[in-house]
Amino acid sequence: MAASTGKLRTLFSAHSSLSARPSSALPALRLTILRSYATTTPPDSSISDPSNSSTTVKRPPTAFKDKLNAGPAFSDFVSGKKDEPLDPAEAYALKTALVGPAGRKKEITRLPSWLKTPIPDSSNYKRIKNDLRGLNLHTVCEEARCPNISDCWGGSSKSAATATIMLMGDTCTRGCRFCSVKTSNKPPPLDPHEPENTAEALSRWGLGYVVLTSVDRDDLADGGARHFAETVLKIKQKAPNILVECLTGDYAGDLEMVALVANSGLDVYAHNVETVEALTPFVRDRRATFQQSLRVLKAAKATKPELITKTSLMLGLGETEAQLWDTLRALRAIDVDVVTFGQYMRPTKRHMAVHEYVRPDVFDMWKERALEMGFLYCASGPLVRSSYKAGEAFIENVLKKKRGKNVGSASGKGTTSENVEKLVAGEAVR
């Protein structure tokens, strides 16, 4: 900038000295004023000199333009040619997708069309949700992000609608790699009003079937078994016609607590093995073992032989066909009555990845195999969960086969409800 200003001053000084001479002695003079620039880069000669039109600067092609040029032409869409089968590379490209910020993208498996569900919207769904909020109750339907929430809460009829209440709070003391429920070593204390509030809500809804489940509470001496049993008693008092299924934890292997819940007046005792034995250490919390789950189901049936026992397995975790056969044989050996199969769906990217999206026809195949092995009922499908349409399944299938048997009959010392009430209160049964 200073150099350019100096040149201007020199030129103007020369012009002043020449203008002082007589006009007859002055030669023709053309004054050129130099323009100074803030940067040191000189202007493009092709721009400053219009005569130099042969040299032009081309703009670099954009990535978007390249993709358009490399893509299909308009004729490809209107040619009317019959679609040809995709080659393996093209099929894989449609099955997967890259997600994440630039430079850190990860390949994920796309969700198949058969796993996509509509947004929940029904009057029964809204009413149940509002009542839950008013009574400070939790459901595993919401906490575990179940895709069937509108289907189950709506139901094909009011009496067949199913709700799954999650007792003892929304924070679990265990951390299974497939589950989206919150975890903590010190969850909040139990709500003493929860059994009464749960019974009150269910009596309002007029449901025909309810599933009670809970988080694991290893911080409690009894694992929450007495709280569970008290809730069942309250429900049966306020709504004696409602069918109750209890989906319990393993109570750290304490079979006395299993017997306490089994004698509480419930209709179905459920405990999930979740996966095959070989994958259990990688899927569930290390405190939950496959053999311990079998002992829980066996103890429930031994406590009350007429009780219906139930379990559930997730597919798509990497299990083999031979491992599934072994699992079903182990379940039938301890007289489990009902089994369900469903697709594992990753709740968040922090949870274990899906190994495989199992096709619907494979689920149908395992349903047929389970029924042939002697299970009373099997619900099997990509969107099936442990309590998926449990009311309809139980009412339409299992109860018909068990009709004529008094499920709630008294046995042993005193009636079932009397014994459980004493145990819940901490009294000895005589």
UniProtKB/Swiss-Prot annotation:
A GO molecular function held by the record: metal ion binding
Pathway(s): Protein modification; protein lipoylation via endogenous pathway; protein N(6)-(lipoyl)lysine from octanoyl-[acyl-carrier-protein]: step 2/2
UniProt-annotated stretches for the region Disordered: 40-63
Keyword Repeat belongs to the record: no
Obligatory cofactor(s): [4Fe-4S] cluster
EC identifiers of the protein: 2.8.1.8
Keyword S-adenosyl-L-methionine in annotation: yes
UniProt catalytic activity: [[Fe-S] cluster scaffold protein carrying a second [4Fe-4S](2+) cluster] + N(6)-octanoyl-L-lysyl-[protein] + 2 oxidized [2Fe-2S]-[ferredoxin] + 2 S-adenosyl-L-methionine + 4 H(+) = [[Fe-S] cluster scaffold protein] + N(6)-[(R)-dihydrolipoyl]-L-lysyl-[protein] + 4 Fe(3+) + 2 hydrogen sulfide + 2 5'-deoxyadenosine + 2 L-methionine + 2 reduced [2Fe-2S]-[ferredoxin]
Cellular localisation: Mitochondrion
InterPro entries: Aldolase_TIM, Elp3/MiaA/NifB-like_rSAM, LIAS_N, Lipoyl_synth, rSAM
Entry-linked SMART domains: Elp3 (SM00729)
Keywords: 4Fe-4S, Iron, Iron-sulfur, Metal-binding, Mitochondrion, S-adenosyl-L-methionine, Transferase, Transit peptide
Transit peptide: 1-37
Binding locations of [4Fe-4S] cluster 1: C141, C146, C152, S387
Gene Ontology CC annotations of this record: mitochondrion
CDD domains in UniProt: Radical_SAM (cd01335)
Predominant place of localization: mitochondrion
HAMAP family: Lipoyl_synth (MF_00206)
Name assigned to this protein: Lipoyl synthase, mitochondrial
Organism of derivation: Ajellomyces dermatitidis (strain ER-3 / ATCC MYA-2586) (Blastomyces dermatitidis)
